[in-house]
């Protein structure tokens, strides 16, 4: 009586293991791959994922389908990936806050953590700006700060309290003792129209999203979240020039569910590496002011550890930790 269920369990486990190994075998991929993006269409993470998918399809010879799962500061998409079958057919292209949600527990409790994901590689480093409409009455960050000091409750747009955009605002507000109202959006795709429409006077969009609007004289940017000025926009000062600390920079990269086989991780990492070396891919990124800084799996895993430490120290200094 005991042997039947025992054998059933043994065969079931063998079958399950075979299915996962088969998925990662030499025939991978043999069907379309889904890439979850945790923000709405139109933002830098979405744009980067779609451009990568276009070039990855050429090498994988299978469709790479980008699916937007926005909401809850990116944790809806993050949880969807952590809960997906680890067979290599569901991946995620995530910003840093979605990749390591546990370090932002001061702002929310995520239903997963970075331990539920496997890093594959880093690809993009977004350039975040402090921007206003071109007809705004301020012509520099200094003028904006002076106005905000005299006018408490000024609205600043960002894309979630776990994001670098929000921390950029908090850095400014804390350093200058400003009383502001932060207004969260699901992503650049919804925040930028709100800025253009005058619903928020100040916002923190990524440069690659608003570059056409800067050139078209619809927006103006006062600063970038970088240690030094961006080569593509040398007239825009970096935050340290105003005396503000930049302890880390955000990133975007590929992730997979925790139990995804090594063969899949290696395959996707190798494909992405080749894509980032493609001159056409590089030229398209440059044209959109998207910075490509590829890191393979091993390097990205090490970087994540440093990133967590740096962010936690920064949040502690800013008083953004639970007591």
Residue spans for each PLM region:
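A short C-terminal helix-loop "cap" of Rossmann-like NAD(P)-dependent dehydrogenase/epimerase domains
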Residues: 30, 57-61, 176, 231, ...
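A ligand-binding cleft/hinge motif common to bilobed small-molecule-binding domains
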Residues: 97-107, 170-175, 202-234, 312
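Short coil/turn segments
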Residues: 40-42, 96-97, 128, 133-138, ...
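Hinge/capping helix and adjacent helix->loop/strand transition within the periplasmic-binding protein
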Residues: 80-89, 103-190, 239, 251-284
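An extracytoplasmic/periplasmic, membrane-proximal ligand-sensing/linker region
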Residues: 30-32, 174-178, 262-323
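Short, low-complexity disordered leader/linker segments with a strong preference
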Residues: 1-30, 322-323
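N-terminal (or domain-start) structured segment
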Residues: 24-116, 153-154, 161, 165, ...
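Short beta-strand/turn micro-motifs at beta-sheet edges
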Residues: 24-25, 116-120, 236, 240-245
């Amino acid at each position: 009586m005991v042997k039947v269920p025992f054998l059933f369990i043994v065969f079931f486990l063998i079958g399950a293991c075979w299915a996962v190994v088969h998925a990662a075998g030499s025939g991978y991929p043999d069907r379309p791959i889904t890439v979850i993006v945790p923000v709405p269409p139109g933002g830098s993470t979405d744009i980067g994922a779609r451009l990568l998918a276009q070039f990855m399809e050429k090498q994988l010879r299978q469709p790479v389908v980008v699916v937007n799962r926005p909401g809850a500061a990116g944790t809806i998409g993050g949880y969807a990936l952590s809960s997906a079958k680890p067979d290599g057919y569901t991946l995620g292209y995530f910003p840093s806050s979605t990749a390591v949600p546990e370090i932002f527990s001061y702002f929310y409790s995520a239903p997963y953590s970075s331990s539920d994901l496997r890093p594959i590689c880093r690809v993009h480093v977004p350039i975040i700006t402090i921007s206003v409409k071109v007809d705004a009455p301020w012509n520099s960050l200094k003028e904006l700060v002076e106005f905000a000091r005299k006018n408490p409750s000024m609205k600043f747009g960002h894309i979630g309290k776990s994001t670098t955009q929000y921390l950029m605002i908090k850095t400014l507000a804390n350093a200058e003792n400003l009383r502001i109202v932060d207004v969260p959006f699901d992503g650049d795709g919804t925040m930028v129209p709100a800025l253009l429409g005058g619903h928020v006077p100040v916002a923190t969009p990524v440069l690659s999203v608003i570059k056409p609007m800067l050139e078209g004289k619809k927006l103006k940017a006062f600063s970038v979240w970088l240690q030094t000025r961006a080569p593509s926009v040398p007239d825009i000062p970096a935050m340290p020039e105003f005396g503000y600390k930049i302890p880390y920079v955000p990133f975007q990269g590929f992730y997979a569910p925790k139990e995804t086989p090594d063969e899949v991780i290696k395959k996707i990492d190798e494909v992405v590496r080749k894509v980032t070396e493609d001159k056409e891919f590089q030229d398209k990124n440059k044209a959109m002011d998207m910075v490509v800084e590829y890191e393979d799996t091993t390097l990205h895993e090490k970087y994540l550890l440093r990133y967590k430490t740096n962010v936690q120290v920064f949040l502690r200094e800013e008083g953004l930790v639970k007591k």
